[in-house]
């Protein structure tokens, strides 16, 4: 068979785009290029896992670094640097006691935070803080943010602290530590996984059971539907409104304000489902990151259900070290508020994230004050639960609006439109103009009624299906995703953090 020069050139261009970093189209979990790479990776991984654990770990580390490169370019050098520094210091820390042990912990945590702050907050500190306070005009070249740095930095810190406190006292080799810190399913946006959850299974080198394989496939399907089908579609209208709120009616602005919380939930939980599913296929259990968060009846409950791995991280490594609830009620309220303020800043270098964190901190304090200090709570009846849910959901949606915008000016225009240009008469025309968007929002909100037991039953029923039926459902799911998402694939929102 003869191939033309054009065909060979096109094939080479396709291969180049698959293996070389493309700034205009970074590799994303859930994309077709990632699926092709993962199938190729999985075949070799399965062989190496049976042959040599060391070879398997080296292979996964190399693939993880390649994945980081495809997402972020050469900025991925920060990842192996962080791994080597943290491993060397924590290994030295194991050999010491007392002040020397504490000094080494302090050193490695400060190094981790210094690197995080340099890449993530330098432009913010110089541009938004220093220039505003001192009326200066300093400017810096834009500093490229290593994708996932907030997540793998927190994993590195948790490992160091748990080693210092001997909560995790298992001997770990350099390869095992690099595997833990670079493991690609959780590299870009978590879940933030503790060493005790991952390294023991890595040492056992167990193959994935058939139940894990099918659970992984189920979660990948669920994540694809959430992210590629629903979130990306909902995002199109939301982005139009948030980019130019003055060109839309008050009703449309309000729709976008309520649409964004649905979008970010589908986006982030969809990514988490896919990453947990990929890890399960590789033989590793990762912790759940979402547990029906929009069913919460208080802000306190919301943070037990939303981004669970981050909530627990801040609880264990910020809130409790600050004193938690052990130093009086006033200090407890202050610790809650400060922890959420830091959590807001963790999300990004913007005053909007600080405000978002402050709103959640305020919500936590108010709920704890009324329920614990005053003993006032809404009765746990159907009507009472409905009222608690409505208050909580509206407050969380209000806080999300600050999370989405770049400055208060945009948000002011949106709420001004809602206040002065809102009419229920827009409801029917809006539905006729955007029926699919409206049905997506209604459908997702109705899914809030879905109980945990029903979800686990659905997952169990999928696992019990014949393997042919499972693969057929997966193929149908892929076809639906390709048909719906082929026009516009949105980057994961949490990639920027």
Label each residue range with its predicted role.
Residues 2-496:
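Membrane-embedded transmembrane alpha-helical bundles that form the catalytic cores
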